[in-house]
Amino acid sequence: MARQYFGTDGIRGRVNTSPMTAETALRLSIAAARTFAPEGGREVVIGRDTRRSGDMIEAALVAGFTSMGITPVLLGVVPTPAVALMARETGAALGVMVSASHNKFEDNGLKLFSPEGIKFDDDTEEALEMAMGTALKGEYAAPAEITLPRTMAGTSNRYVRRCLDTLAGGQDFSKLKVVLDCAHGAGFETGPAALTELGAQLTVIGAAPDGININAGFGSTATGALKAAVLETGAHIGIALDGDADRLIVIDETGTEADGDQVMGLIAGEMHRTGRLKGGGMVATVMSNMGLSEYLKTEGLTLARTKVGDRYVGEHMRAHGFNLGGEQSGHIILSDVSTTGDGLLAGLQILSVLAARGGKASDMLRVFTPAPQELINIRYSGANPLESDRVKTALAEAEGLLGDRGRMVVRKSGTEPLIRVMAEALDEDLMLKALHHAANAVTAAAGNS
């Protein structure tokens, strides 16, 4: 079925524009209450990031849940993985995170978690889509059964402690110089708290949220400020979170960026070496570099691929017994501890390896030599360019150029009006030829030529 609300990662869009309106949040909360707690009397945990519209969306959720006899438990500003944690540890019927992740403040979104702290699968989202359409026409709780929201203090401390407890005792982090970029987002308190407790020599940037500066010039998709701070302070390593702190990008001491593929490769190798890796390998998406796959082969490990979205990675991990997975964009799932991507948790594992091994982050994070890979994002309005016959022909031609010497992934973003065109091959000239052949066709169909 065609979806009106849900995309790759929950519901997301420009605030006060469909689908990201207060009415959508109201419909969702009522539909979710009827679907997951039809008898009422349950609790739902709700967290949010720092963007200005978060209070508005939260208020709409509260109105819907209380009208159905469900008690909203307000966690305040917390990372997305903290909401997943509290959903599974409090017996809640549902967890809701109000966030648009790495997007600017003009956008917001809703991420949903089951009582097990797991993002909903496609079938569940489609059931909610159906229920949201008629949400305002059904019955509500009797007046005496309408609930009141309550706040829950201590979620941030509980989450930080859970992350820190994953580290081996007795490690000395006091010699590590670390710069942490919190993106003016949900991790602006939890990230510094965790690294301060470690005893690292810490410099914090991007930790002064004002409601509109989330992800603006800071964070995992804007690493210029972090690179400059690492070089200026002589830090050994820099870590950038995104707006809801469920992913990270790492910067080495030279100011060079290491993406999620390199981070996953490092963690996989370390977990394999210490006998903690399950499933004989790890899980990533179709966007991960083929160099990661080749590296894992040399270690006797496998790489399973899914479509884009950390929830699909998580689904495959649970179904096939893996405990490590993630995305090139920096969502890393360590399922022995967390059920979803977690930037702080992954960052702590990297710092632990660096503290144990010594040496330079630049050496440690160069786990494999990436195959030449390039991604072009093409914005569009109106019809989906991928429906064009000319685009379909051009994509087939580009894939024919690559043959078995490379890969091409072309997809519509589930969170923004973008077509993403990615190509990779060991032969860079071949990769670029195929990439631009495909991208030019998409650009023309999008009306950008």
Swiss-Prot record:
GO terms for cellular component: cytosol. It is an enzyme of class 5 (isomerase). InterPro entries: A-D-PHexomutase_a/b/a-I, A-D-PHexomutase_a/b/a-I/II/III, A-D-PHexomutase_a/b/a-II, A-D-PHexomutase_a/b/a-III, A-D-PHexomutase_C, A-D-PHexomutase_C_sf, Alpha-D-phosphohexomutase_SF, GlmM_bact. The modification Phosphoserine is found at S101. It catalyses: alpha-D-glucosamine 1-phosphate = D-glucosamine 6-phosphate. Activated by phosphorylation. Binds 1 Mg(2+) ion per subunit. GO terms for molecular function: magnesium ion binding; phosphoglucosamine mutase activity; phosphomannomutase activity. Gene3D superfamilies: Alpha-D-Glucose-1,6-Bisphosphate, subunit A, domain 3, Alpha-D-phosphohexomutase, C-terminal domain. Pfam families: PGM_PMM_I (PF02878), PGM_PMM_II (PF02879), PGM_PMM_III (PF02880), PGM_PMM_IV (PF00408). Its cofactor is Mg(2+). Keywords: Isomerase, Magnesium, Metal-binding, Phosphoprotein. Belongs to the phosphohexose mutase family. HAMAP family: GlmM_B (MF_01554_B). NCBIfam families: glmM, PRK10887.1. PANTHER family: PHOSPHOGLUCOMUTASE (ALPHA-D-GLUCOSE-1,6-BISPHOSPHATE-DEPENDENT), PHOSPHOHEXOSE MUTASE. This is Phosphoglucosamine mutase. It comes from Hyphomonas neptunium (strain ATCC 15444).
